[in-house]
C-alpha cells in the first residue's frame, strides 16, 4: 500500500476517529445511558472498522493469521464479558472474524470463477453459499453484534468493486465503487436495525475521503489491543462509581 503523502485521510486517521467514537459510545452505555447523543456518536465507529476489515482482507499477506488473531482477541473479550455479566455475547471482533470468513470465501469464488472449468466454478459457488448459510445459522443461534447483515456488510464493498472492474473497465481505481457499494450495504443495515443506527450514515463522507494509504505509522498492535483494553477500563470505572 502506497505510504506517500496524498490528499484525503489515511486508514490510521479514520480508524482513530472511529476508536474515539467507540469510546464515547461505550462510556454512554456504561456511565451515561440517559445521554442518547453519546450513542449516536458511537454509531460512527462500526462502519469504519467494518470497511477496514474489507481492506485488510485484500491486503494482508497472512489471511488466516489475520483471522485467528482477530478471533482470538474476540474470544478473550467473550470470556471476559461472561465472567463480568454471566451472559454470552458475540462482540464486534467476533462479527469481524465472521466477516473475514465471508470475504475469504468470496475471494476464493473469484479465483475459481477465473478458471475455465465448470467444476471449479461450482466448487467456488458451493463454498460461498455454504459459508453464508453457516454464518446465517450462527447468527440465529448466537447473539452476534450487528447480526447477519453486520457480518456481510464488507461484502457489499467487494461486490461493488468486482462489478465495477468487470463492466465499467476501471483501471484499478476501485475505491469509489467500493465505498459506494459499502454505502448501500450500510443503508440496508441501518434500515434493518432501525432506531439511531441511521446516524451511522454520517460517516460516509469520511470513507469517501479515504485515500487508500495505511498511514505513516504502524498502529496495528494498538488497534488490536484497543478494544479489550478500553472495555476493561470503562468497566472498572463503572464498578467504582
Residue ranges and their predicted role:
Residues 1-241:
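Alpha-helical transmembrane segments and their immediate juxtamembrane cytosolic regions
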Amino acid at each position: 500500500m502506497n505510504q506517500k503523502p496524498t490528499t484525503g485521510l489515511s486508514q490510521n486517521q479514520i480508524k482513530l476517529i472511529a476508536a474515539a467514537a467507540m469510546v464515547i459510545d461505550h462510556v454512554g452505555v456504561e456511565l451515561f445511558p440517559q445521554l442518547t447523543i453519546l450513542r449516536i456518536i458511537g454509531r460512527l465507529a462500526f462502519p469504519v472498522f467494518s470497511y477496514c476489515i474489507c481492506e485488510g482482507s485484500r491486503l494482508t499477506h497472512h489471511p488466516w493469521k489475520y483471522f485467528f488473531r482477530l478471533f482470538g482477541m474476540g474470544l478473550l473479550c467473550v470470556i471476559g464479558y461472561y465472567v463480568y455479566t454471566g451472559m454470552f455475547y458475540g462482540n464486534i471482533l467476533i462479527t469481524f472474524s465472521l466477516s473475514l470468513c465471508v470475504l475469504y470465501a468470496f475471494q476464493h469464488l473469484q479465483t475459481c470463477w477465473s478458471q475455465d472449468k465448470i467444476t471449479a466454478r461450482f466448487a467456488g459457488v458451493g463454498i460461498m453459499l455454504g459459508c453464508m448459510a453457516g454464518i446465517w445459522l450462527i447468527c440465529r443461534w448466537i447473539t452476534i453484534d450487528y447480526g447477519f447483515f453486520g457480518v456481510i456488510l464488507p461484502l457489499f464493498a467487494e461486490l461493488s468493486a468486482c462489478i465495477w472492474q468487470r463492466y465499467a473497465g476501471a483501471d484499478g481505481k476501485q475505491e469509489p465503487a467500493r465505498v459506494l457499494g459499502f454505502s448501500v450495504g450500510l443503508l440496508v443495515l441501518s434500515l434493518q436495525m432501525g432506531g439511531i443506527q441511521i446516524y451511522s450514515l454520517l460517516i460516509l463522507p469520511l470513507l469517501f475521503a479515504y485515500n487508500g494509504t495505511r498511514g505513516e505509522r504502524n498502529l496495528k498492535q494498538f488497534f488490536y489491543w484497543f478494544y479489550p483494553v478500553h472495555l476493561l477500563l470503562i468497566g472498572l470505572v463503572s464498578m467504582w462509581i
